[in-house]
Amino acid sequence: MELTQLINSVSSIQITGNIQRKDVADIVYDSRKVQKNSVFVAVKGFNNDGHRFLQEAIAKGAIAVVVENNEALPDDLITHSQIAKILVKDSRKALAELSKGFYKNPTSTLKLIGITGTNGKTTSAFILKNIFQSNGYKSGLIGTIANYIGTEKVDAKLTTPESNDLNKMFYEMIQAGCEFAVMEVSSHSLILNRVYGLCFKTAIFSNITSDHLDFHKSFDDYLKAKKILFDNLNNSSFAIINKDDINSEQIVKDSKAEVFTYGISDGADYKIKNIIYDLTGTDFSITYKKTDYKIHTSLIGVFNAYNAKHPHLQQLIVWGLVQKK
């Protein structure tokens, strides 16, 4: 994709310098990975600031740089280097927008399911991927333990990778023939705009407890972070929430998605009951519209039954509703 076309993807404040009619080789936020004809996005991190490495990126052949701080790169250096400087309000959002454009908006094609919550994300994501695979649907996974592009395992460095890495992996999933993608969505990634612009078909809320307050500072901030995922769903999406968690209604309060609830609580759309476990695993049933669905999992214990029920609900809900749309 030409730079002249790609810059239309980003919400810019000002563009100066030379916008070259060249194909962009890559979008990068790590100056060590800059190659000729890359676009370098200067992102402020916790320990480093990408604005410190702008000149290094230019020296390595970047044809454009994206900055939040207009003073980080003098205009005379831009003129001398014959590159473009793109000033934005939020570099992380710009990285997501550029990556989405560069990789041809891959989540508009994939059926993307996001799982968020303090507990149960990893177990639910892996079981759900296996459900899709066992039914003949090739799928990808983004998670804490590992990422998968179909059956190919890719090492995971973060629970939810940066937006550029996410869009690249989703693009690769499509190339590999994947129809579904399941991902863990951390609260950190929601605040840091790593999942900004992704098209989620379904979002699942497991629960929320007073963890990660070192990052979010308060429980209210933590709750607001989780809520971002559901606020950004459109009216053709689905939200699946744990009715047993007292914060579940707050999570979907402003969501446009169709909402389904699950849990042991009365009034849940999908009511969990009759949980029995022994050394062979756990049995329970899910009742929906007066019909009982019996479930068995090799995971042992009430807690693991709670984890297991999320993906089994997907088998009942996502399996039917996502494909219907």
Report residues per predicted region.
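N-terminal leader/targeting and accessory segments in enzymes
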Residues: M1-E97, I246, K271-I276, I300, ...
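N-terminal-biased segments
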Residues: M1-Q20, N119-I131, N135, D266
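Short, well-ordered coil/turn elements that cap or connect secondary structure elements
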Residues: V10, R21, K60, H80-Q82, ...
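Short, well-ordered beta-strand core segments
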Residues: F40, V65, K85, A203-I204, ...
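Short, acidic/turn-prone active-site loops that include or flank metal/cofactor-
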Residues: E71, D90-K93, N207-D211, I264-G267
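Active-site regions of enzymes building and remodeling cell-envelope glycoconjugates
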Residues: L77-V88, V154-K157, K256-T261
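Phosphate-binding loop of NTP-binding sites
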Residues: K93-K243, N247-A257, Y288, K309, ...
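Adenine nucleotide phosphate-binding catalytic loops in nucleotide-utilizing enzymes
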Residues: H216-L223, K227, K253, A257-K325
